[in-house]
């Protein structure tokens, strides 16, 4: 069981506010094209991130095979802390990849401590 960080309650509250806003957009328009993305500094299994990506939304990074499902390496541990959550209208036909060009490199050789996440979303 991973340790519970002191910031967890704040992250969960923030995720709940964002989730409520995204749900309100879907209530107004069931075909709304909603994207919530970024360096959330939290894992896919954390309560806040899991809530953001719960149905009907989808965390596209979870489509990747587990060995490729990371965007950051800290003290030798590969971690997924960057996320792309989309509404059903965007999930259909979406493509996602993480380009592992930074996280596996030494500090001197990389341009960032995170790998870039590439997402292709369907046109209307």
Spans of features found by a protein language model:
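Metal-dependent phosphoester-hydrolase catalytic domains
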Residues: 12, 19-35, 40-124
């Amino acid at each position: 069981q991973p340790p519970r960080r002191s910031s967890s309650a704040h992250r969960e509250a923030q995720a709940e506010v964002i989730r409520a806003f995204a749900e309100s957009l879907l209530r107004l328009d069931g075909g709304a094209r909603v994207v919530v993305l970024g360096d959330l500094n939290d894992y896919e299994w954390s309560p806040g991130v899991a809530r953001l990506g719960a149905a009907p939304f989808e965390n596209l990074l979870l489509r990747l095979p587990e060995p490729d499902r990371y965007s950051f390496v800290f003290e030798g541990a590969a971690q997924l802390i960057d996320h792309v959550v989309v509404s059903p209208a965007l999930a259909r036909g979406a493509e996602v990849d993480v380009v592992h060009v930074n996280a596996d490199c030494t500090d001197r050789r990389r341009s960032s401590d995170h790998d870039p996440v590439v997402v292709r979303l369907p046109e209307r």
